[in-house]
Amino acid sequence: MPTKKSIAFVTNTSWSIYKFRLYLIETLISKGYSIYVLAPRDKYTAQFSDLPGVTYIELTKFKGRSLSPLHDLALYRELLHHYNRIRPDLIFHYTVKANLFGALAAARARIPAVCVVTGLGYTFAGKGWLQSTVKILYKRACRKCTEVWFLNEDDRHFFTEERLVAPGRTFVLPGEGVDSVAFFPAPFEPGKPAVTFLLIGRIIRHKGIYEFVRAAELLRQQGLAIRCQLLGFYDDGNPVAIPRHKVEEWSSRRILTYLGHTDDVAPFIEQADCIVLPSYREGLPLSLLEGASMCKALIAADTPGCRTLIEEGVNGYLCREKDAEDLAKKMAVYYHLPAAAKRQMGIEARDKVLAGFTRERIAGIYLQKIDSLLARPVVSGTSAITNS
C-alpha cells in the first residue's frame, strides 16, 4: 500500500461498532489503514476510541427515531462538516439515517461511500407514509452511493424490485461475522430433565416474542418439560416495543424466564438446547450465528435473514411467520428428537458457520472489496464510482 488509506465507519450507536465491527476495524488497522469512527457517544465508546489507529468523532445530531426534518438536516450538516474536514478515502454507513443522510453528505464532499442495509426493520414492515417516505429517500441516497450492501438476498431483491438501486451496484455480505473461538461448543449433555429454548433479541414485537410466549403456553398444555428463556434489552423508545409489565407478567406466570441483558451471551447459549428467533425480518441475526457456532440447533421464522442460516431438518427448523402454533409444532419436533439427532443437528449448525460466516471470512471480504472500491475512479459531482 503506497500511502496510508483511511476508512470511516458511520453508525447510530457506538455499541454497534463494538458489537459487530471491532474485529473488522482491528484487522484493517493491522493492514495499514487508519480508521475513523463517527457515532454518538455511549458506554461502549471507550471500547474502541483509544485503540491505536482509531480516531473517534462524536456525532451529536443523531436523533435516531426522530421524524423531524430539522433534526435530519442538522445530521446531514454535521456529517458533511466532518467529511470535509477529515477527507477519508472511503466511508461505510450503517443503519437507516446514516445511510440516507451520510450518502448525501459523502456525495457532496465527493468521497466514495457504501451504504450497508443491515436489515429493513419496522420502517418497512407496514404500508404507510413512513415506508413511502423512506423509500423515496433511499432511492435518492442509493443513487449517490458507490455501492449498496445487504446482509441477505431477500433485502437486495426488495430494493432492486422497488427500483431503489440498480442491481449492478449491489452486493450481499454474508452477515457481520461470528467469533467461532469465543463461541465454542461445550460438551453435549444428553438426558436433561427439561429442554431449554432461548430467544435472544431486543424486547420488541417484531422479534416474534409474542409468538414465542404463545408457543410456550401451547407446549406446556401438552405436558412437555420445557424451559423458555428471553435474553435482551428493553427498547422503550421503539414504536414496536413490548411493555415491561408484559414481560413481568409472563415471568410471574412462569411462561418464560426473563434473563435480563448482558454483553456476554455465551454462558446463556451454553445452557440452552435450542436457539429460537421467530422474527418478522432480519439482516442476518447474530444470535442465530452465535448459537449455531456453539452447536445449538436453530428454530426461526421463514423470513428474510432468518432463512439464510437454516437447512430444514438438518441444523434446525423454519416456522411460518407470525404463527405461534406452527412455531410450537417445530419446537415439539425438536423436543422429541433422540439425543443423538439433537447432537448431530448442533454439529451441522456449527459446520455451516465455519463454512461461511466467521468473522475472519467477513473481514477478508471487506479487504477485497475495499481494494476494489478504492481502485475505481470517482464520478464528478457524486460519490458514485463507475462500475459499468
Q: Where are the predicted features?
A:
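A conserved mid-protein helix/loop that constitutes part of the nucleotide-sugar donor-binding site
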Residues: 19-23, 195, 202-218, 325
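Short, structured helix-loop element that forms part of the nucleotide-activated donor/catalytic region
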Residues: 45-49, 157, 222, 227-254
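Donor nucleotide-sugar binding/catalytic pocket of nucleotide-sugar-dependent glycosyltransferases
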Residues: 57-58, 139-185
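Short His-centered aromatic/hydrophobic patch
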Residues: 93-99, 117
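Aromatic "clamp/platform" in nucleotide-sugar-dependent glycosyltransferases that forms part
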Residues: 261, 280
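Short hydrophobic beta-strand element within catalytic cores of glycosyltransferases
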Residues: 297-300, 310
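Conserved acidic donor-binding segment of nucleotide-sugar-dependent glycosyltransferases
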Residues: 312-313, 317-324, 333-339
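A short, well-ordered alpha-helix in the C-terminal region of glycosyltransferases
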Residues: 326, 340-356, 365-368
